[in-house]
Design a protein with these regions (language model features):
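Helical mechanochemical/support elements of P-loop NTPase systems and associated helical scaffolds
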Residues: 3, 46, 70, 153, ...
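Conserved helicase motor
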Residues: 65-69, 85-98, 111-115
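Conserved RecA-like helicase motor-core motifs
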Residues: 15-22, 62, 79-95
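Interdomain hinge/linker at the junction between the two RecA-like core domains of SF2 helicases
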Residues: 2-54
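Conserved strand-helix element at the start of the C-terminal RecA-like helicase core
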Residues: 1, 54-78
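Conserved RecA-like P-loop NTPase helicase motor core
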Residues: 99-188
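Gly-rich Lys/Arg/Thr-decorated short loops/hinges at beta-loop-alpha junctions or inter-strand turns
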Residues: 26-36, 79, 140-148
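Long, largely alpha-helical accessory region at the distal end of helicase-like NTP-driven motors
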Residues: 171-228
Length: 228
């Protein structure tokens, strides 16, 4: 956060001295991410089938959703269709995420959370991003959608996306599947003018995911990512 004046707006300080970035630090990410965008080739009617199939494949997952209403809907879906999978929310792991870690099959549903809780290594290899919004409050939403101030928040939105997709890959040897479902955040991950703003490694991972996702013809094609 710096090139667009984000720090100055947040703190109200006019002049901020910035420490230089370590060589190549801004060009590398933590771990590897296999992106999949099933909505690009499969209909929305397949979304629930994709979630169930990937959950059964990986057993443990993290679910990022926009609000508590969406969280309740996802929780109900798991209770109805994936009865052997334990469902946790932010309150359940507030003091410790160990109950989730110790479960053989589980998901943790986090509403409107871009950062703050990490799941490294085998804690979770699967991350669902479900209609996650680019804004976190009404003021940001108003300025972006009604006042045409999207450029002012472009850097902040990009940072949030980077934080969101990295919840399950927290060290250089870590890896995770990132399944993006819904239109809100997907637009920032599929448009070429937006993709080129990301670091080279993340940009390549997104591009690879886009190319693969265009050829899905059924849910089984999505499951081919188990090779990853």
């Amino acid at each position: 956060l710096g090139r667009s004046g984000e720090l100055e707006r947040i703190t109200g300080i006019e002049k901020i001295f910035r420490l230089p970035i370590v060589n190549d630090w801004d060009k590398k990410g933590l771990g590897r991410k296999f992106f999949t965008f099933p909505d690009l080739s499969l209909g929305k009617e397949e979304q629930e089938n994709i979630v169930a199939a990937l959950q059964n494949l990986c057993k443990k997952s993290v679910f990022l959703v926009p609000d508590s209403q969406s969280a309740d809907a996802i929780k109900q879906f798991y209770e109805d269709n994936l009865k052997d999978t334990k469902v946790f929310d932010a309150k359940d792991i507030e003091e410790s995420k160990q109950p989730f870690v110790d479960s053989s099959a589980a998901t943790v549903i986090l509403a409107n959370r871009f950062d703050g809780i990490d799941f490294s290594n085998d804690e979770s290899r699967l991350l669902f991003i479900w209609n996650l919004p680019k804004t976190t409050n009404l003021q940001e939403k108003f300025l972006i959608t009604r006042m045409g101030a999207s450029k002012l928040y472009a850097e902040r939105i990009r940072t949030r996306i980077i934080q969101a997709v990295g919840r399950c890959s927290r060290n250089p040897s870590d890896y995770s599947i990132v399944c993006v479902i819904g239109d809100t955040i997907q637009n920032d991950l599929t448009k070429q003018e937006k993709i080129k703003q990301f670091a080279p490694e993340l940009r390549a991972e997104i591009q690879f995911g886009l190319e693969n996702s265009m050829d899905y013809s059924n849910v089984n094609d999505v499951l081919e990512l188990k090779i990853f």
